[in-house]
Structure formats: structure tokens, C-alpha cells
Curated annotation (Swiss-Prot):
Gene3D superfamilies: ATP-grasp fold, B domain (3.30.470.20), Phosphorylase Kinase, domain 1 (3.30.200.20). It comes from Marinobacter nauticus (strain ATCC 700491 / DSM 11845 / VT8) (Marinobacter aquaeolei). It comes from the Bacteria. The lineage of its organism: Bacteria, Pseudomonadati, Pseudomonadota, Gammaproteobacteria, Pseudomonadales. Signal peptide: none annotated. GO terms for molecular function: ATP binding; phosphoribosylaminoimidazolesuccinocarboxamide synthase activity. PROSITE patterns: SAICAR_SYNTHETASE_1 (PS01057), SAICAR_SYNTHETASE_2 (PS01058). Keywords: ATP-binding, Ligase, Nucleotide-binding, Purine biosynthesis. This is Phosphoribosylaminoimidazole-succinocarboxamide synthase. Pathway: Purine metabolism; IMP biosynthesis via de novo pathway; 5-amino-1-(5-phospho-D-ribosyl)imidazole-4-carboxamide from 5-amino-1-(5-phospho-D-ribosyl)imidazole-4-carboxylate: step 1/2. It is an enzyme of class 6 (ligase).
Length: 237
């Protein structure tokens, strides 16, 4: 597989074309940002940690019947992925109240949400990823009703798989965001799953073990990401 020109560079990942028009190389960089890019930093080993973390999670989800774009690791910081037509709507499931939910509704952090909540957000940094609903998504042509239903179904299936995985390792999966795309008429999980895009707490101490460590200046960001990975059985070296 020959890696060719860069197609897109996001805040923490880059996408490269390959000699196969249906395959891309996803490169995880050491760049870290928060608050729509207002806070930025380079964190050593982050690209490697998130790449291997994502590979582990994607393989678990594939084994559970969730279709993903992940095809395999190419190097410490690179993965081979299927080309998707991405849907510009993020799916968010919350098992515990935290983050924007608390700010928006004035609820305290740490409340168990039963059943877990499901929300949609438009992927748009300039607008700060506003919350939207199925009606808006269909009316503006971001996704069809049946696609949104499938995205919701898969997002909850991911929760069933990963909530138990983290719980068995002594951690709470507080919330997470997923992005989906289209491939051959199928809805497929794209982007990544890493501590950058979810909230993870220690089950006993409620220690934050995700990107909130960077957002809130708690320190030991990558060391904590690696601790999460080790608890799950991920080998980084």
C-alpha cells in the first residue's frame, strides 16, 4: 500500500490518499487541542497511544458486529482505513452526567443516567458543534431518517460493548462521541475511539482518565491514557 498526498489535516489526525482509491492512511499526530482549537499543545507519544488504543477498540467493535472503517495498523502512528462518505453529525451517548450536559441543564456532575441519553451535534467548529435533532438533520440533507436510525442503533450497540469492557477493567465509560459514514449503502463507524473523544473515570476514585485532564490542566495526560490502555490489555511498546 503506497501512501500518497495528504488529503486532510484535522486537529489531531491527518488523512492521506493511497494507491487504492478506496483506502486511506489515517495518521495520529502528537497534537492536542481543546475548546475548538483555542488551547493547543504537543504531547509526546500521544499519536502512538491513540492509534493503538483506537485499533484495539475498533477490533473489539468489529468482533461484536459493529461495521467500522478500520482495516489494520500500518505503523505506530498510522492505520489503514476504508474510504467513507462522512456524515457531518456526531452521535453522543452519556451514561453519567458531565461536560456540556451539566453546563446546558445546570445538573451536577456524576449523576447516573438511566437509560443512557443520546444526542446529535453538527460537526462544525466555527459554530462550536451545535446540538441538533433528527428533523434538522433530515431537512438539511445531512442524513436520511433511516441512516439516523441506524446510527442511533449502532451508537447504543457500541455502548453495550464498551461499557462492559471498561467496567470489567475498573473504569466508568461516562460518555463518548462517534462519527459515521456511508460505504456501499451501509452505515459504517469512522473517525476514532480514544480518550480524546470520550470520558473515562476510575470506578472507585472517579479520577478523570481522558482528555479532560488536558482541558482542565490536571496533568499526566498521556500517562493516564496509557494507564487506561494497560487496564484494557493494550500493549503500547
Amino acid at each position: 500500500m503506497e501512501k500518497r498526498e495528504e488529503l486532510y489535516a484535522g486537529k489531531a489526525k491527518s488523512v492521506y490518499r493511497t494507491d487504492d482509491p478506496e483506502r486511506f492512511v489515517l495518521v495520529f499526530r502528537d497534537d492536542t487541542s481543546a475548546f475548538d482549537g483555542e488551547k493547543k499543545e504537543q504531547l509526546n507519544r500521544k499519536g502512538m497511544v491513540n492509534n493503538k488504543f483506537n485499533a484495539f477498540i475498533m477490533e473489539k467493535l468489529e468482533a461484536a458486529g459493529v461495521p467500522t472503517h478500520f482495516e489494520g495498523l500500518l505503523s505506530d502512528t498510522e492505520s489503514l482505513v476504508k474510504k467513507l462518505e462522512m456524515i457531518p453529525v456526531e452521535c453522543v451517548v452519556r451514561n453519567v452526567s458531565a461536560g456540556s450536559l451539566c453546563r446546558r441543564l445546570g445538573v451536577e456532575e456524576g449523576l447516573e443516567l438511566n437509560p443512557p441519553t443520546f444526542e446529535l451535534f453538527l460537526k462544525n467548529d466555527a459554530l462550536h458543534d451545535p446540538m441538533v435533532n433528527e428533523s434538522l438533520a433530515v431537512s438539511f440533507g445531512w442524513a436520511k431518517a433511516d441512516e439516523l436510525a441506524r446510527m442511533k442503533e449502532l451508537t447504543y450497540k457500541v455502548n453495550d460493548v464498551l461499557k462492559k469492557l471498561f467496567d470489567d477493567a475498573g473504569m466508568l465509560l461516562v460518555d463518548y462521541k462517534l462519527e459515521f459514514g456511508r460505504s456501499g449503502g451501509q452505515i459504517v463507524l469512522g473517525d476514532e475511539f480514544s480518550p480524546d473523544g470520550c470520558r473515562i473515570w476510575d470506578k472507585e476514585t472517579r479520577k478523570k482518565m481522558d482528555k479532560d485532564r488536558f482541558r482542565q490542566g490536571l496533568g499526566e495526560v498521556i500517562e493516564t491514557y496509557e494507564e487506561v490502555g494497560r487496564r484494557l490489555g493494550i500493549k503500547f511498546d
